[in-house]
Amino acid sequence: MRIISRPTSEGEAPEHWALDAGAADIATLDIPPSAHRSRIFAIDIRFMVRATAAGAWQALSVELNGVREWSRRIDTHGQTDTLDYHCRRELDIGQALRVRALTQLGDARRLRLFIEAEEQAGP
């Protein structure tokens, strides 16, 4: 598991947080709070699998700060397939964010689970 982060001070480049969980079934990315400003993050989660038999399927559930945000189960098409989720989340001053991705599969093999959060310009 590898965490990539680029935190910033006010006036510098936007924050970029990423977690490459490899073939893990669960990934958690923690974004610490800022004591000085509110922030908006674009969050992307990608789950990639390889089918090992006919009838393969994959599922991804996303939690933000412990609350289920989204969940989907789909049939795996082709030799490899991905299941992606994208959302935006606004964080007030002092608010942290925990992004958790949980996966399941049938007749498939996990290849990669990746979470990325990129700070966006304000409203």
What do these predicted regions represent?
Residues A27-P33, D81-R89:
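Exposed aromatic-hydrophobic patches
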Residues P32, D44-R50:
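Short edge beta-strand/loop segments characteristic of extracellular beta-sandwich folds
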Residues M1-I26, D30-A35, L105-P123:
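C-terminal interaction-tip segments
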Residues A13-L19, R68-G78:
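Solvent-exposed serine/threonine-rich low-complexity stretches and specific carbohydrate-binding patches
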Residues R46-M48, E63, W70:
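Short, charge-rich amphipathic interface segments used for partner binding and complex assembly
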Residues S38-I43, R88-R112, Q120:
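Noncatalytic modules at the cell exterior or secretory-pathway interfaces
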Residues A53-R68:
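Short, surface-exposed beta-strand/strand-loop-strand elements in extracellular ectodomains
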Residues H36-R39, A51-A56, D107:
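A short beta-turn/strand-edge loop motif at beta-sheet boundaries
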